């Protein structure tokens, strides 16, 4: 997705939060207060000084008046005044003392009150603090429990969004993350952690309630990067990233201001060609990226002259095609750098990128390849996305889309492609083809005229569908002939008008037939027909109909009968393979249909273009340390070739990887990104629209190394000695040997001011030191040197300094030479040099080493005392800085001439630096090893001890195979201790060292001794194993035993051999040695040992069985023996155990074995036979006993017995104590999982909450909670249950009983909860229903009713007296009415009714006659209702037989509802 560009005119707005304003306010107030205090102090000091000066003046004046003796009267007057003042002063002092005492007492009282108040407040604070601490401890525990429950890994809710901004604007990246504990967020820029302290004010990072923000202030071009945010907590890590592209505003909207003119003039859009000198300082290299990532190709350069108004032109090319800015690419040029940024890479962007700086002075360019790999597929094994979508032949409703296929190496081949279209301005993608199209071309029809579309393609293989390709450029569905029919008519003067050709043709009614019908595209899936519109065509819109006919059939079939075609193009699908067709086209408008066009020639649906043949011979050649040049012969059949794909494989692995991800059109390709020193093979395949060719033949194996060239020039030519007639010169070897060993050097000389050079040596000189003879004393000479290798003679060095030929006679030594460096690390390096050729008047006794930073002036001496060695390790250097060094030799006469300054050395460890490793090989030889994958054919390993090359063949042996070298120590001892180093020539300073100290040597020698004197490794030591029948097996297992291995068993220092008592055997294939004892008894206590010999190797293992260890083995053996005897008859394979079924029944289960028909199985409880409904089926081997609704009555000892003539066995399980508790918990688990939701049942007593379960007992651990507070059973809230449910009865509920109720049942591990919110409408409805039930119960309790006394049938003889008596109840007393046959009974002597104490009621019928037979009813009713009871009376005559009737029963009452007024009450 492209980045959203922020408009350049958007202004920056800085926001200040509340805390910032508070800080500013506090600062101003503090500053104001300090100034106020200073001014107050100054004014008080000033007034104080004025007051003191005035007092001094007044005292002096007063003193002067007293001393004056002019007037005696004045003196006496003053004495009186003085006396009066003294008495007034004493009274004032007394008053002031009293006032002061009163004030002191008042202040003391206030102080006592303050102390008392302070003590009270302190006591309150201490109490509050104690309570607060208690609450904090409780909350901390609850918080810990809560935090554990809500802990989760980070999850990003809103991801980062990419931005494109102008330079010097601010950009803010935001995202939202949640998680607990709160995730820690770190920001990264291109994988590097962002540090705010490194660039103060540059970055601002904020975090508020899960929203994290990174603000980049005043963004510049270097801030273009991929920014990532990583959120981490204890449960995981998650990240998100976005791209920030910083564009440079070029000032197109703002005119350039002239310095000399008062007005602004716009800069000319034409850049005048001016001569510029362009020098690249930093260049972009070969780049590897993946689809979807961002990248910026950038070059920094020095442009001379640097003119602000006039600049050279920067042009970017991809595969020699000029690029322009688009939504995918952004370009920038200015301020000494040119860049090309990609906001979202696709494989379309892969290619060779070239930056060309064009000016009058010429073209300066730089090229490098950008590789774009496939993004991870949506489905594993799916192919990569197609690329390079192009739209061709766009018309009113038709366009052809073409693309290039993806490369497949490890994926299965591509079977076809799906083409999708999307109307511009929408985001609705529509698949154009139902079945995958086989070739990389598809005609899309059904477009709407005038609308614009974009397209994308997806590849399909057997694994799935690829990611979609990059969308194509928008294409409009328009007729390209419309502009062709537009003509210009010239009028008088320079005027002209534009008219359509249709206006010149006049009014045409029915159009003519189309012309030029032909097949423009033929493939196996479709045929594209093209034609020319009829002439004249008329002004009305034209439509076309296409007809087809099989050759020879004579019948025509209209292809587009339903939808007319508006474009002179049409793709015909569904043609039968192998048959030829002819076509014709008819044009139509609103006036009618034209005649058919001419018939085309026969056309057959087939692939005109075939798959290309495989490319020819593939040749790989060396290029650089990480690249190889691959060339191949073009295929014989290269019709419509799209390009080639190159694959590579590490030799011997058969794991092929693509080298390029977009077809290349030339038959030579440089493969980058290879591993130095690795061996590869290559293959090539050709690609066209139909598919890919077969793979070419594989290339020969090639090792990745730099190409063989001539060596670079030597350098550092130094004069080492001169005797007046000859000079001894030294120099340094070339930095690059060219890939082959240097064979020697050629030296040329000339006198200063001479033009011609003269050859010094006709044959190459091998050493890097040479004496030049035949020189003239006092003359000045200069020299140059060239190196030679197998490729030829390299470039000569620059001429040396001017050396004067005069004899050296100074007593001090000459300069050291050939300064080299190795083991360059982050803070240290090792420096080596060679001794001076000229030693002076006495031998060289030591050396001083000086260093300095490259641009510093003063030299710093490393060693304060001279070193006698010609090497020195320089430490404590600063990483990343560049230093230069020199060496000064010292003899008895002083310090000699310093050596030439070394080349600058960057103190930094090389990436991938390897060190020497110490080890022991399979033969026990100690060695030091070193690997170097960067070596070339000319590279050599040089091993040194104390930095002196090793040449002692008696103590050392060097073996080098490929890029691996080993230094063997033949007879290691203390003389071999020291520092060993290795260096590899013709590399970028690859070297390492290793200090062999006594501890390391001892370790290596111990390992060597173990290999030379081996022991047999054991997989397992001697152990025992007890079998059935009580047999004991002693065994061990060795890693490996040869057929010649021997062994022996020793028991208590006595060897035992294979016998009936001790059966010993050995399986040498598996290494197992064992001894089996059939009878293990008390006599077998002791120590068991096995000794093994196999060639030189030997091993021993012992097992001590004494004391408790022996008793354990003996008891186990006896137990196994008894078990064996038990299993000879019927026995339990699994003893009695229990589980709980889904129906909450306890099931006792045991497994039996070795039974027969006569075997008797019994269940016993407390030694009493336990009867079961069904007998167990012993053939199944499983016996079960179900105990439904377990309770304490089921406590007891349960036994299962087996018995027949072979023996018997018993299994016992006691249900009590912990076993019973565990059963209850298991039942709780089943019931808790199946418990129903809480239900509300209203009763006259209150509201009842019920939870139905499969089984419930009071012994289950259940809790009822109200608002998360546990409820205890009370009169107000009663807790109980039945076998089917648990309930909570809320008696007489009130408003306080509202809230959430929870029922919990604990199963020993988990709490199973059911909750109900009894508040709001739910509580109101339940409370109303409770009131109704309560009123109904009250009415039911107090209504009129019959307590007893009346039968339902009465039989009596005529003439007798019938007395019907009953007892009634009601509150208030009920009204009693008697009826006969539903009619009121008229009281008389015959019928009499009696009521006693308002509850005993009787009716008497005297002299019963047959007319008294019938139904008698009694109504008992008060205001709460009542009952009606019917009694049937049957009268028979005297002498008649008593009728047969059912025995009388209690009469059944019928309810009588209460009156309306009573119901309302």
Curated annotation (Swiss-Prot):
Protein's UniProt keywords contain Repeat: yes
GO CC term (a single one): mitochondrion
One BP annotation, GO: extraocular skeletal muscle development
Bias kind Low complexity: ranges: 41-61
Binding partners and assembly: Interacts with TTN/titin.
MF terms in GO: kinase binding; structural constituent of muscle
Organism: Homo sapiens (Human)
Main subcellular localisation: cytoplasm
Record-annotated Ig-like C2-type domain positions: 154-245, 266-371, 904-1002, 1130-1211, 1345-1434
Fibronectin type-III domain span: 385-480, 513-608, 614-707, 710-812, 815-912
Organism taxonomic ancestry: Eukaryota, Metazoa, Chordata, Craniata, Vertebrata
Protein name as annotated: Myomesin-2
Entry-linked CDD domains: FN3, Ig, IgI_M-protein_C, IgI_titin_I1-like
Subcellular compartments: Cytoplasm, Myofibril, Sarcomere, M line
InterPro entries tied to this protein: FN3_dom (IPR003961), FN3_sf (IPR036116), Ig-like_dom (IPR007110), Ig-like_dom_sf (IPR036179), Ig-like_fold (IPR013783), Ig_I-set (IPR013098), Ig_sub (IPR003599), Ig_sub2 (IPR003598)
Protein's UniProt keywords contain S-adenosyl-L-methionine: no
The entry's keywords: Cytoplasm, Immunoglobulin domain, Muscle protein, Repeat, Thick filament
Cited function: Major component of the vertebrate myofibrillar M band. Binds myosin, titin, and light meromyosin. This binding is dose dependent.
GN (gene name): MYOM2
PROSITE patterns: FN3 (PS50853), IG_LIKE (PS50835)
Region named Disordered: 38-61, 1442-1465
């Amino acid at each position: 997705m492209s980045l959203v560009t922020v408009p350049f005119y958007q202004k920056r707005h800085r926001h200040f939060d509340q805390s910032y304003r508070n800080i500013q306010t506090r600062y101003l107030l503090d500053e104001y207060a300090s100034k106020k205090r200073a001014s107050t102090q100054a004014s008080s000091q000033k007034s104080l000084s004025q007051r003191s000066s005035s007092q001094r003046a007044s005292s002096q004046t007063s003193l002067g008046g007293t001393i004056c003796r002019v007037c005696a009267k004045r003196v006496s007057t003053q004495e009186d005044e003085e006396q009066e003042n003294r008495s007034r002063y004493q009274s004032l002092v007394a008053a002031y003392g009293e006032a002061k005492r009163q004030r002191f007492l008042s202040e003391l009282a206030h102080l006592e009150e303050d102390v008392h108040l302070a003590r009270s407040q302190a006591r309150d604070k201490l109490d509050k603090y104690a309570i607060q601490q208690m609450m904090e401890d409780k909350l901390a525990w609850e918080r810990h429990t809560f935090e554990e429950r809500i802990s989760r890994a980070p999850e990003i809710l809103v991801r980062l969004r990419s931005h494109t901004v102008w330079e010097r604007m601010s950009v803010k990246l935001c995202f939202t993350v949640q998680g607990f504990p709160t995730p820690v967020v770190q920001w990264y820029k291109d994988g590097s952690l962002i540090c705010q302290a490194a660039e103060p004010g540059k970055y601002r990072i904020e975090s508020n309630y899960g929203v994290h923000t990174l603000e980049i202030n005043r963004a510049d071009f270097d801030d273009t990067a991929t920014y990532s945010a990583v959120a981490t907590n204890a449960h995981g890590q998650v990240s998100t990233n976005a791209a920030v592209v910083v564009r440079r505003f070029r000032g197109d909207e703002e005119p350039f201001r002239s310095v000399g003119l008062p007005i602004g003039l716009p800069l000319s859009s034409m850049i005048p060609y001016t001569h510029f000198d362009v020098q690249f300082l930093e260049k972009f290299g070969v780049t590897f990226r993946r689809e979807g990532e961002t990248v910026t190709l950038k070059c920094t350069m020095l442009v001379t002259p640097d003119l602000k108004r006039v600049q050279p032109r920067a042009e970017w090319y991809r595969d020699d095609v000029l690029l322009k800015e688009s939504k995918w690419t952004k370009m920038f040029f200015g301020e000494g750098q040119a860049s090309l940024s990609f906001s979202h890479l696709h494989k379309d962007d892969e290619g060779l990128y070239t930056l060309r700086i064009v000016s009058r002075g010429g073209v300066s360019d730089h090229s490098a390849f950008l590789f774009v790999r496939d993004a991870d597929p949506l489905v594993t094994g799916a192919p990569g996305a197609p690329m390079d979508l192009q739209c061709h032949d766009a018309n009113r409703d038709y366009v052809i889309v073409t693309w290039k296929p993806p490369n497949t190496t490890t994926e299965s081949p591509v079977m076809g492609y799906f083409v999708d279209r999307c109307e511009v301005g929408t985001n609705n993608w529509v698949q154009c083809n139902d079945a995958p199209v086989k070739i990389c071309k598809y005609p899309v029809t059904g477009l709407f005229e005038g609308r614009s579309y974009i397209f994308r393609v997806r590849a399909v293989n057997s694994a799935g569908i690829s990611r979609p390709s990059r969308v194509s450029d928008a294409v409009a569905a328009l007729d390209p002939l419309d502009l062709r029919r537009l003509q210009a008519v010239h009028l008088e003067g320079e005027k002209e008008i534009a008219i359509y050709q249709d206006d010149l043709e006049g009014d045409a009614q029915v159009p003519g037939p189309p012309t030029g019908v032909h097949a423009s595209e033929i493939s196996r899936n479709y045929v594209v027909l093209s034609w020319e519109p009829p002439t004249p065509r008329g002004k009305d819109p034209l439509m076309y109909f296409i007809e087809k006919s099989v050759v020879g059939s004579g019948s025509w079939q209209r292809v587009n009968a339903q939808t007319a075609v508006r474009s002179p193009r049409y793709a015909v699908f569904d043609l039968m393979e192998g048959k030829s067709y002819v076509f014709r086209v008819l044009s139509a408008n609103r006036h009618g249909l034209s005649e058919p066009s001419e018939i085309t020639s026969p056309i057959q649906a087939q692939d005109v273009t075939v798959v290309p043949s495989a490319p020819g011979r593939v040749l790989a050649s060396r290029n650089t340390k990480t690249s190889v040049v691959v060339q191949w012969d073009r295929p014989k059949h290269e019709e419509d070739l799209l390009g080639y794909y190159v694959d590579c494989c590490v030799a011997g692995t058969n794991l092929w990887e693509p080298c390029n991800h977009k077809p290349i059109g030339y038959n030579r390709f440089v493969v980058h990104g290879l591993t130095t020193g690795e061996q590869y093979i290559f293959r090539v395949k050709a690609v066209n629209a139909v598919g890919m060719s077969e793979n070419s033949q594989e290339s020969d194996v090639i090792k990745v190394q730099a190409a063989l060239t001539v060596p670079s020039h030597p350098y550092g030519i130094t004069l080492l000695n001169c005797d007046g007639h000859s000079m001894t010169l030294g120099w340094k070897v070339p930095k690059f040997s060219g890939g082959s060993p240097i064979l020697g050097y050629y030296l040329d000389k000339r006198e200063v001011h001479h033009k011609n050079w003269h050859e010094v040596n006709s044959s190459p000189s091998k050493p890097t030191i040479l004496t030049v003879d035949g020189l003239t004393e006092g003359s000045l000479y200069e020299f140059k040197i060239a190196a030679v290798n197998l490729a030829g003679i390299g470039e000569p060095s620059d001429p040396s300094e001017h050396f004067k030929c005069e004899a050296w006679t100074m007593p001090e030594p000459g300069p050291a030479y050939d300064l080299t460096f190795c083991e360059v690390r982050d803070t240290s390096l090792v420096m080596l040099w060679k001794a001076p050729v000229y030693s002076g008047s006495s031998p060289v006794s030591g050396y001083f080493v000086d260093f300095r930073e490259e641009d510093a002036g003063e030299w710093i001496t490393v060693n304060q005392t001279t070193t006698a060695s010609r090497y020195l390790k320089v430490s404590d250097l600063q990483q990343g800085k560049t230093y230069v060094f020199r060496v000064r030799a010292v003899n008895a006469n002083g310090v000699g001439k310093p050596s030439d300054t070394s080349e600058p050395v960057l103190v930094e460890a090389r990436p991938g630096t390897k060190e020497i490793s110490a080890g022991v090989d399979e033969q026990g030889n100690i060695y030091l090893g070193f690997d170097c994958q960067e070596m070339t054919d000319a590279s050599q390993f040089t091993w040194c001890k104390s930095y002196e090359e090793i040449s002692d063949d008696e103590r050392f042996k060097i073996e080098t195979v490929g890029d691996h070298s080993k230094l063997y120590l033949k007879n290691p001892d203390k003389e071999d201790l020291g520092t060993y180093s290795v260096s590899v020539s013709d590399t970028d300073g690859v070297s390492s060292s290793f200090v062999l100290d006594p501890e390391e040597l001892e370790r290596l020698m111990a390992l060597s001794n173990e290999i030379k004197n081996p022991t047999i490794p054991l997989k397992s030591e001697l152990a025992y194993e007890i079998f059935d029948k009580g047999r004991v097996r002693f065994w061990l297992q060795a890693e490996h035993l040869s057929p010649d291995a021997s062994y022996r068993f020793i028991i208590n220092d006595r060897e035992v051999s294979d016998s009936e008592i001790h059966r010993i055997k050995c399986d040498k294939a598996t290494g197992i040695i064992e001894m089996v004892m059939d009878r293990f008894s008390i006599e077998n206590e002791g120590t068991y040992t096995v000794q093994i010999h196999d060639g030189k190797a030997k091993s021993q293992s012992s097992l001590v069985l004494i004391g408790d260890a022996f008793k354990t083995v003996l008891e186990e053996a006896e137990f196994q023996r008894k078990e064996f005897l038990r299993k000879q008859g019927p026995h339990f394979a699994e003893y009695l155990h229990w589980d709980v079924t889904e129906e909450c029944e306890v099931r006792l289960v045991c497994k039996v074995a070795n039974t027969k028909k006569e075997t008797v199985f019994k269940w016993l409880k407390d030694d009493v036979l336990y009867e079961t409904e069904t007998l167990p089926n012993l053939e199944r081997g499983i016996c079960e006993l179900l105990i439904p609704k377990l309770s304490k009555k089921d406590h007891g000892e349960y036994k299962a017995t087996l018995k027949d003539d072979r023996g018997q066995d018993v299994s016992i399980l006691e249900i009590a104590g912990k076993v019973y508790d565990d059963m209850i918990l298991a039942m709780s688990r089943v019931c808790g999982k199946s418990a129903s939701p809480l239900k509300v049942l209203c009763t006259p007593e209150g509201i009842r909450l019920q939870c139905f379960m499969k089984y419930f007992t009071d012994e289950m651990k259940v809790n009822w909670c109200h608002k998360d507070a546990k409820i205890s059973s009370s009169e107000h809230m009663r807790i109980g249950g039945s076998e089917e449910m648990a309930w909570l009865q809320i008696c007489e509920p009130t408003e306080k009983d509202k809230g959430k109720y929870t029922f919990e049942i604990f199963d020993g591990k988990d709490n199973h909860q059911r909750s109900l919110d009894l508040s709001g409408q739910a509580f109101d409805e339940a409370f109303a229903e409770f009131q109704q039930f309560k009123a109904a119960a009250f009415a039911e309790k107090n209504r009129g009713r019959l307590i007893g006394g009346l039968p339902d049938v009465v039989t009596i003889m005529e003439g007798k007296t019938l007395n019907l008596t009953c007892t009634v109840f009601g509150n208030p007393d009920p009204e009693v009415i008697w009826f006969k046959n539903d009619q009121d009974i008229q009281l008389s002597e015959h019928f009499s009714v009696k009521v006693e104490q308002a509850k005993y009621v009787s009716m008497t019928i005297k002299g019963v006659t047959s007319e008294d037979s019938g139904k008698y009813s009694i109504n008992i009713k008060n205001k709460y209702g009542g009952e009606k009871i019917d009694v049937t009376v049957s009268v028979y005559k005297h002498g008649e037989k008593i009728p047969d009737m059912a025995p009388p029963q209690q009469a059944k009452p019928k309810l009588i509802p209460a009156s309306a007024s009573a119901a309302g009450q």
